[in-house]
């Protein structure tokens, strides 16, 4: 009798574990259905990184390149859009904790990040550059031992440690704080995506005192971040991004924020393509 009871206990425990595992998997793997049921998609995006995402001075709404893509994704999902303001260091934690369903916040696709979240096809291609005082050297290697400012949690921060191990990298919560450090002389250069630096410099009252170095620190592809294993949601995101390219809306969004008439004009040298 004792043996039978023990066996029954083992079977019961095994069934409980199996059911728990299935329940957890179902809850994890059905985020698309959860979003549609809730009627809202929560998207982590920047609120201080123009032209990708920043607060409009007149409307006080968050606007930008990323925001327009977030709006398009919400529309194809058939739900309302809830923007969740973030900074580079908080993007992935917000997604993993469930406080955001998607990351549309200028997040670079890297092998390290791909271990913990999934990425869509790239919807933007950029590169890291340096912003320095106008009289500074033009070559990146001249800053090999310099004090360089970067934004926490960005690929630029990581690349600096790899490319210039002798430099002193100072990390900041966002790019405006890094610019303040450059103005104050706390750093000799700051690095960020080329498009963000162009927008930052254009809006600076003292922009004549600074310049963006032409040489790229790195070339980077930007994608939408999705929680690991959410294949159905990822497919919807990818399909919509490819559709936006096909119907010309992706180009229209690009021109609004990076076209010739904008504060940070950049030629569009990429297409959204399946990989």
Question: For the regions a protein language model found, what residue spans apply to each?
Answer:
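Short helices/loops that flank or line small-molecule/ion binding pockets
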Residues: 75-76, 84-85, 89-102, 116-118, ...
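Flexible hinge/capping segments at coil-to-helix
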Residues: 32, 132-148
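Beta->alpha turn/N-cap motifs
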Residues: 44-49, 84-89, 98, 102-110, ...
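Short helix-initiation/N-cap motifs at beta->coil->alpha
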Residues: 67, 82-93, 135, 152, ...
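Extracytoplasmic small-molecule ligand-binding "clamshell" domains
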Residues: 30-106
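Extended ligand-binding regions for polar small-molecule ligands
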Residues: 67-76, 136, 145-147, 154-155, ...
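Periplasmic-binding protein-like
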Residues: 47, 124-131, 194, 198-241, ...
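Ligand-binding clefts/hinges and TM-proximal coupling segments of bilobed small-molecule sensing domains
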Residues: 159-172, 241-275
